């Protein structure tokens, strides 16, 4: 049984606990977050986007009791001071968003943990993993890895199929993305000085940047320099879609594209021909759900523009992939 600690009990940290409770061989034994434990337990139990937690949680001195099992709760700002060695922590799931550099994340290792998985994009000095795309790049000797971003986890399986089967010359991706807590609920100064994210999240379509297209090269090196992209934040709390417009090396048909995607489907990469909307993907465990009804091809002067699209729950889809990576990393650890 691998012992897991979660550092940062926000949107991803709380959903990670839900998922880990369903995964044999993993046990969350500790959580670290600076927020009051009573508040954390309430936010874990009641979730506006993902629904109520079906199990039981109660707060006691210095701990939660989740489905009858005690989970220690700490409120320590410096990860290096956490008792990971005493608790025998195998892997820390780093979900604060603050310790995304290798040196900073290694504070958990210095505190006694064996491994760290960062729930965010990280630097080029770390392996960036999208499960069922490049997790076999891991050999178990790594101490810190990145689970990439929610959008990279959506884009990578679709891009891999296109590149493996037909070859990608170049492409541009757009994620139509739910709003997140780095936006304002009402107009006001943004903490990072972003004039667009300073505007009310639930009122407008808000253009934003995304690193997913460039980060894809950390997952699929053959795509380095071939993709770019942007994001459009829209007024829904979760449920997003990524569109990829590509120029391929081979002439293709819609049927060939869809057949290739269907053949590649697995636990991480779903396939649907249903006319779904974003509300239908809230809570799914696929990291990416390919929508065959949205595949389009335009022939232009002997060349083709190929548009493909995949849905994802930017919260639960990503968390499910993150936990798969976590479980695999714990299993192969050396």
Curated annotation (Swiss-Prot):
D-glyceraldehyde 3-phosphate binds at residues 149-151, 180, 197, 210-211, 233. It holds the Pfam family Gp_dh_C. Optimum temperature is 10 degrees Celsius. Above 65 degrees Celsius no activity is detected. GO terms for biological process: glucose metabolic process; glycolytic process. InterPro entries: GlycerAld/Erythrose_P_DH, GlycerAld_3-P_DH_AS, GlycerAld_3-P_DH_cat, GlycerAld_3-P_DH_NAD(P)-bd, Glyceraldehyde-3-P_DH_1, NAD(P)-bd_dom_sf. The record marks 177 as: Activates thiol group during catalysis. Its EC number is 1.2.1.12. It is found in: Cytoplasm. Pathway: Carbohydrate degradation; glycolysis; pyruvate from D-glyceraldehyde 3-phosphate: step 1/5. Optimum pH is 9.3. Above pH 10, stability decreases rapidly. The active site is at 150 (nucleophile). It comes from the Bacteria. NAD(+) binds at residues 11-12, 33, 119, 181, 314. GO terms for cellular component: cytoplasm. Keywords: Cytoplasm, Glycolysis, NAD, Nucleotide-binding, Oxidoreductase. Gene3D superfamilies: Dihydrodipicolinate Reductase, domain 2, NAD(P)-binding Rossmann-like Domain. Catalyzes the oxidative phosphorylation of glyceraldehyde 3-phosphate (G3P) to 1,3-bisphosphoglycerate (BPG) using the cofactor NAD. The first reaction step involves the formation of a hemiacetal intermediate between G3P and a cysteine residue, and this hemiacetal intermediate is then oxidized to a thioester, with concomitant reduction of NAD to NADH. The reduced NADH is then exchanged with the second NAD, and the thioester is attacked by a nucleophilic inorganic phosphate to produce BPG. Homotetramer. This is Glyceraldehyde-3-phosphate dehydrogenase. The gene is gap.
